[in-house]
From Swiss-Prot:
Pfam families: AAA, AAA_2. Gene3D superfamilies: 1.10.8.60, DNA helicase RuvA subunit, C-terminal domain (1.10.8.10), P-loop containing nucleotide triphosphate hydrolases (3.40.50.300). ATPase subunit of a proteasome-like degradation complex; this subunit has chaperone activity. The binding of ATP and its subsequent hydrolysis by HslU are essential for unfolding of protein substrates subsequently hydrolyzed by HslV. HslU recognizes the N-terminal part of its protein substrates and unfolds these before they are guided to HslV for hydrolysis. This is ATP-dependent protease ATPase subunit HslU. The lineage of its organism: Bacteria, Pseudomonadati, Pseudomonadota, Gammaproteobacteria, Alteromonadales. Belongs to the ClpX chaperone family. HslU subfamily. A double ring-shaped homohexamer of HslV is capped on each side by a ring-shaped HslU homohexamer. The assembly of the HslU/HslV complex is dependent on binding of ATP. The keyword Hydrolase does not apply. CDD domains: RecA-like_HslU. It comes from the Bacteria.
Length: 441
């Protein structure tokens, strides 16, 4: 679990996302509150429930990007799902409980990686011994000895192995056969039976080994993973993962506006209102059965987001509105924001283009007025056609550098200056012609 302060979280988000200070503050506080809650005594901790967040803002302003960056910062089980993928129980589509099952799977993966890191030193020692055994088979009379012969020859080979002198030498080793991965599409309500069937098929090949020939460097990596996996206690792993999900899990529900009921149509709508009703128990707290055990959702943090262009937050059913108490509105982006997006974030669009062309030996220089012209062009197209936010910059940038990208291999060693004139020559016709803008930009 991340121990970063809200100020540190916002600072980290600032290096990737321009503006939207209120949204960054809200998610930073929510993330810090997860840590604060864990500092309370156990009895009081149960009473403190997370304050779920609803982010409202037009498309392309950074809602999904905030979620992506938050996942990296949280160091906790995190899952981003599209609300449109789910339907009411009994209809075609995923059940909402699958969200918690997927979250638990991600926690298992996270916990396994942590435990394998702790066992790494012991795993490396065991892998080293296995490789030395393959390089120096024991003499027949030594087979009954429990401890391998630590002779001078073995020490010489151990030294060479550690120094990387034997990396390219090929050896034959026994490696565990990969588990048989079988995907079974289950009808609603039969997930438990499906999980048992999958486990049965996976266990059929368990314990089998396969003899393979490979370079020592590759064999060593494989053996370290194998030995580390042997040292991980599966029961403890599941217990810790479920605890991690229940206390630190974060679910990001994207496109929640698409499951709002629109218009005055009567009767239930299984792919909209039905999904909201199914989401209610998860958000307010229930117990979900997963293949790893029962998971309580009482303290999982839910962050929902939507553009709400065709609907409004009040179109959500009242019960769900009440479970999303913190509302954050994200601002539409201006031409100045576009200019900052092109230059300020880590690995910005201009930096990416410079790096990509650099691989062909072409040097690109973006001038101040050139960047301003690109930002202005993207903003104008957004104003005249559909406003898709910062995503428009990708389209404009690709169109601007299309010819250069095509001919880059023939221009090795040259320097291209992208200034206002260059932008005008390549984009003006498209930007001014509204019909062309609609189809090309």
């Amino acid at each position: 679990m991340s121990e970063m302060t809200p100020r540190e979280i916002v600072h980290e988000l600032d290096s990737h996302i321009i503006g939207q200070h209120n949204a960054k503050r809200s998610v930073a506080i929510a993330l810090r509150n997860r840590w604060r809650r864990m500092q309370l005594d156990a009895d009081f901790r149960q009473e403190v429930t997370p304050k779920n967040i609803l982010m409202i803002g037009p498309t392309g302003v950074g809602k999904t990007e905030i979620a992506r960056r938050l996942a990296k910062l949280a160091r906790a089980p995190f899952i981003k799902v599209e609300a449109t993928k789910f339907t009411e129980v009994g209809y075609v589509g995923k059940e909402v409980e699958q969200i918690i099952r997927d979250l638990t799977d991600s926690a298992i993966k996270l916990t396994r990686e942590e435990q394998m890191k702790k066992c790494k030193f012991r795993a490396e020692e065991a892998a080293e011994e296995r490789i030395l055994d393959a390089l120096l088979p024991k003499a027949k009379e030594d087979w009954d000895n429990e401890k391998p012969d630590d002779s001078a020859t073995r020490q010489v080979f151990r030294k060479k192995l550690r120094e990387g002198q034997l990396d390219d030498k090929e050896i034959e080793i026994d490696v565990s056969a990969p588990q048989v991965g079988i995907e079974i599409m289950s009808p609603p309500g039969m997930e438990e039976m499906t999980n048992q069937l999958q486990s049965m098929f996976q266990n059929m090949g368990l314990g089998a080994s396969k003899r393979r020939k490979m370079p020592i460097k590759e064999a060593y990596k494989l053996m370290v993973e194998e030995e580390a996996a042997k040292l991980v206690n599966q029961d403890d792993l599941k217990e810790q993962a479920i605890e991690l999900v229940e206390q630190h899990g974060i679910v990001f529900l994207d496109e929640i506006d698409k499951i709002c009921k629109r218009g005055e149509a009567s009767g239930p709508d299984v792919s909209r209102e039905g999904v909201q009703r199914d989401l209610l128990p998860l958000v307010e707290g229930c117990t979900v059965n997963t293949k790893h055990g029962m998971v309580k959702t009482d303290h999982i943090l839910f962050i929902a987001s939507g553009a709400f262009q065709m609907s409004k937050p009040s179109d959500l059913i009242p019960e769900l509105q009440g479970r999303l108490p913190i509302r954050v509105e994200l601002d539409a982006l201006s031409a100045d924001d576009f200019k900052r997006i092109l230059t300020e974030p880590h690995a910005s669009l201009t930096e990416q283009q410079i790096a990509l062309m650099g691989t062909e030996g072409v040097k690109i220089e973006f001038t101040e007025d050139g960047i301003e012209s690109i930002a202005q062009a993207a903003w104008q197209v957004n104003e005249r056609t559909e406003n898709i936010g910062a995503r428009r910059l990708h389209t404009v940038m690709e169109k601007l550098t299309e010819e250069l990208s095509y001919e880059a291999s023939d221009k090795s060693g040259s320097t291209i200056v992208i200034d206002a004139k260059y932008v005008s020559d390549h984009l003006d016709n498209l930007v001014q012609d509204e019909d062309l803008s609609r189809f090309i930009l």
